[in-house]
Swiss-Prot record:
InterPro entries found in the cross-reference section: Elp3/MiaA/NifB-like_rSAM (IPR006638), Methylthiotransferase (IPR005839), Methylthiotransferase_CS (IPR020612), Methylthiotransferase_N (IPR013848), Methylthiotransferase_N_sf (IPR038135), NA-bd_OB-fold (IPR012340), Ribosomal_uS12_MeSTrfase_RimO (IPR005840), rSAM (IPR007197)
Provenance organism: Methylococcus capsulatus (strain ATCC 33009 / NCIMB 11132 / Bath)
Protein name: Ribosomal protein uS12 methylthiotransferase RimO
MF term (GO), any: metal ion binding
Main enzyme class: transferase
Amino acid sequence: MKLPRIGFISLGCPKALVDSERIITQLRAEGYAIVPTYQDADLVVVNTCGFIDAAVEESLEAIGEAVAENGKVIVTGCLGERPEEIQARHPAVLKVTGAHAYEEVMNAVHEHLPPLHDPFMDLVPPQGVRLTPRHYAYLKISEGCNHRCSFCIIPALRGDLVSRPIGEVMTEAERLVAAGVKEILVVSQDTSAYGADLGYRTGFWGGRPLRTRFQELARALGDLGVWIRLHYVYPYPHVDEVIPLMAEGRLLPYLDIPFQHASARVLKAMKRPAATENILAAIRRWREVCPELTLRSTFIVGFPGETEDEFRELLDFLEEARLDRVGCFEYSPVKGAAANALPDPVPAEVKAERHARLMEVQERISAARLRTRIGRTETVLVDEVVEEGAVARRRADAPEIDGQVFIDGATHLEVGEFVEATFEDADAHDLWARLAD
């Protein structure tokens, strides 16, 4: 008997990818086959992104393609919070659900493509179905956000902060490690707020009490013996408490911490922490405790009302902070964001020019910091083996968004293998290396 077949398109951030993995895991458990082409699918699920206008358009185009190529389409994800927009553009869509609406998605699938039988879990590995390579995985610890940044609509799309029970998070992490995962990337909308909504209550893992708190979770994950990387960390004072764990080697010495700007006035308009001097002081403290710390951040240029002097404050901040990795976005209005009502929009050509200037400054800083690694030997994790050699990452590099290490001729290595590499050359993003003697 032929299994019902589902095509699946996953768009957006790693947190959305985790949602896709959960839906696909349940589909597999219920006997649905996941297929790679529209032609082979009986129905298509599209997990969308609705964070910025470009992502909205990409999602709408993906939905349109699925409708044109297959005809039976269910839409979920962040853009699903705006069903009228989806249905106006694509009225043939069968069902629209919001973000992390797993049960609604499954009910829609059941309605339009019933399963052949009741669920049977032997089709699914204990760690669930993942969409990442086998050697690394994203671990989502919470959903939603309690902040109200004026440029952001995440709380409207995904709600306020809802932390997962710490025992559930740790059990999932253990299963990932047992399945051979070498690196766990901790994600959420606000990782360092973990447990705040639960009053940091005590949970249980492995029969022992464990507080539902960012610091305790980081410490427990650090005991699992794999790379643990922290993403989407908000600059709360208690972040200081995890830096010693990085210095000890229990966590990767890496923080993904979006600062967004450096001008006090712009930060206030963004409804972000507005004390840049405190951020610089924190960076100095962190580096004193953990000199190997890698800092990644993101910034927005061209926010409404941003002046040339305020933009130069941001450039001065970059010069002083000496961050390792930086992402930069030109501000664009997002439907439903409070910032849309702010006066004095920055012209598009000015936004583009400031973006280019910022990235030029940061490329010089990143290149200088990477050049200090030449001649050093470090442990790297192999992501890919190609004809020319191996492509790997350092502890300082997250997959997809950071740099890579190219090891010429190392075609005998295995994906997911840890090796020692000596760095011989660098640019602003990547390193070239040989296997250590």
